Every structure is written in C-alpha cells, then in structure tokens.
Amino acid sequence: MERIVVTLGERSYPITIASGLFNEPASFLPLKSGEQVMLVTNETLAPLYLDKVRGVLEQAGVNVDSVILPDGEQYKSLAVLDTVFTALLQKPHGRDTTLVALGGGVVGDLTGFAAASYQRGVRFIQVPTTLLSQVDSSVGGKTAANHPLGKNMIGAFYQPASVVVDLDCLKTLPPRELVSGLAEVIKYGIILDGAFFNWLEENLDALLRLDGPAMAYCIRRCCELKAEVVAADERETGLRALLNLGHTFGHAIEAEMGYGNWLHGEAVAAGMVMAARTSERLGQFSSAETQRIITLLKRAGLPVNGPREMSAQAYLPHMLRDKKVLAGEIRLILPLAIGKSEVRSGVSHELVLNAIADCQSA
C-alpha cells in the first residue's frame, strides 16, 4: 500500500493506492460508524462496483444512499448536477453527510462540485476508477460542470477528505479509456520530470498490458507530482497552471467536436503536440524533442493531430474563453525541454494558428 499526503494545513488529506481497497472498510477513512453517505456513480460502473462499495461501507456501520448518473462527458452538466442535489434533498441529507464519488473524471468533478455547493459545503471522498482520474482529476480539488460554450467553466476549488485508488478498477476499464488516461501520465513527464518521461519510454508496453508493479509505480509517481504542485499552488496562480499542458488546445477540440466524441485524454494528447509545435516555432523547443513526444503518444495509441474537420481558426474562440486568459490574452503552457515547461503570454495568434496547422497536416 502506498500513501501520499496532499499537504494543505488543516485541509491535508491522504491518497491511498493499492489493490483490494474495496474489500477494506478502513480504506474509506475518515468515515465512521453511524455517519451518512451519498454514493454517486454512473450507469456503467454501478453494476460493477456499487454493491461492493456499498457493502464495505455498511460493514463499517455507515448509512448509504446512492444516485446513479448517466455515463459520458456530455452529461457533465448543470442539469445532471441537479439530480445529485435532488437526491440529497429528498432523503434529506444534512451538513454532516459525506458524498463519495465512485467513478472517473465526470463523476468526480460533478460530485465534488455538489459537495462544494450543497448546504454551502459538505465533506466528500474521491474513489477514482479510471486511470485519468487516478493520476490527475481526483487529486487537487478542482470541481466543475461543463457549459456548451466551454469545458469546466462553472465550478469551485474544493478539496476531498481523502482519495482512494483501488488499482483493481483498471481491470474493468475499456482499452480506449486506459489509453486516454496515459495522455495525462505522459503530460507529467513533459512538464515536470524528464526522468519519469524516460521511464515511460522504457515501460509503456508494461502499462498497456496493466502490469501491476509498473502501474502502481506510474500512478504513485503522478500523484506525488500532483500533490507537490497542489501543495505549492492550490488555486492555480502560478506553478499549478503547468498541469494544463495541452488543455487549452484540447478543451477547444472537446467543445467544438461535442463533449464525448473525443475523450479528454485524446484531445489533450493532440493539444500537447500543438503546444510543442508552438514552442518550436518560438525557437525554444527542439524538433527532436517534439518527435520524442509524438513517438510516445503514438505508441500509446493516442492521436497526435487535431480533427481533420476542425480548422485552425475554429480553435481561437474556444481558446479565448480559456480559464487561463488574462486581460484578453491567451496564456499557453509550453515545453522548454522534456521535464521543463513555462506559462507563456503574448504569443501571436498567427503563430499559434500556424502551429495548429502543422498538426493538422502532419
């Protein structure tokens, strides 16, 4: 068992990583006997894990209600969020309840936002079931719903009480979702840890076949990096923005193509190549390093080009609505070397459009 602490003073919390955590009531600390829980999951995961997690919580003396959401990025909406509030109010659940998010990024983000908002804030626990959510979205307290005009535009920073990562969940993950999660894994190597990127080049095949020790190390390293960044910059005023490598471009793809048509990791993968091409055009990143990124993404089965049917010009309106925009200027996360990156303002729209076009025609 691995345990990593996100250090935020009185709001610090553990990330527990191991196989078989769903069999142990103690995994779901700080829940105690007699407490009330609303377990939030989706229609795909409910048949796989709802009864098991409910059972282990009830074994610990916890009173469990549940709400099952539709599955898919297109359902990360205020309308679906309202079904969580309705379920809480119908019981009713008070301020002493705990929400448990059993699912991937959509379930985790919506549940966290519900917890931040319900009666002005109740406790919640993240139980991520996808690789993407285990290495990224479950850690750090970003919660949100999408809007038709932009991804994650309505939300709050609200930290969980704990994160429970059961590695066994990856055994039921569809291959496309596993590959999508690898985009966020590769991101950490590009922005923060060149040695980890080297390790990924050497161990990618083991990750694709769900090798236990390799996957455990991979998830632990990603969570360590994320925990360090969040502890240093919880509300994304500086360092934490680096975690958005590829996301300014990727969110544009998701919004333009319709949420769910491109998985988040797929869009981020293409976006990371666009960021690398932008950095190349600025003369601060080598084509050889861009090629290393492209090669690793391709080996993982991820796209390295944007959608053929989406013109370079179609990215700009979405990018100008990005949450990192300041004073009307797009701020981009750009690699400087494998393992080092920066937040860059003032890049001309023409250069950005040319970098996108590089990826469209590649």
Curated annotation (Swiss-Prot):
User: Which principal EC class is assigned to this enzyme?
Assistant: lyase
* Reactions catalysed, as given in the entry: 7-phospho-2-dehydro-3-deoxy-D-arabino-heptonate = 3-dehydroquinate + phosphate
Q: Which residues bind NAD(+)?
A: 71-76, 105-109, 129-130, 142, 151, 169-172
Q: How is the cofactor bound?
A: Binds 1 divalent metal cation per subunit. Can use either Co(2+) or Zn(2+).
MF terms from GO for this chain are:
3-dehydroquinate synthase activity; metal ion binding; nucleotide binding
Please give a single GO biological process term from the UniProt record.
Answer: amino acid biosynthetic process
Is-annotated flag, keyword rRNA-binding? no
Q: What is its main location?
A: cytoplasm
UniProt superkingdom: Bacteria
Keywords, sorted A to Z: Amino-acid biosynthesis, Aromatic amino acid biosynthesis, Cobalt, Cytoplasm, Lyase, Metal-binding, NAD, Nucleotide-binding, Zinc
- What Gene3D superfamilies does UniProt report for this protein, alphabetically? 3.40.50.1970, Dehydroquinate synthase-like - alpha domain
Q: Where in the cell is it found?
A: Cytoplasm
Q: Which Pfam families match?
A: DHQ_synthase, DHQS_C
User: What cofactor does this protein call for?
Assistant: Co(2+); Zn(2+); NAD(+)
Provide the function of this protein. Catalyzes the conversion of 3-deoxy-D-arabino-heptulosonate 7-phosphate (DAHP) to dehydroquinate (DHQ).
The family this protein is said to belong to: Belongs to the sugar phosphate cyclases superfamily. Dehydroquinate synthase family.
Query: Mind telling me what this protein is named?
Result: 3-dehydroquinate synthase
Taxonomic source organism:
Shigella boydii serotype 18 (strain CDC 3083-94 / BS512)
Lineage start: Bacteria, Pseudomonadati, Pseudomonadota, Gammaproteobacteria, Enterobacterales
Q: Which gene encodes it?
A: aroB
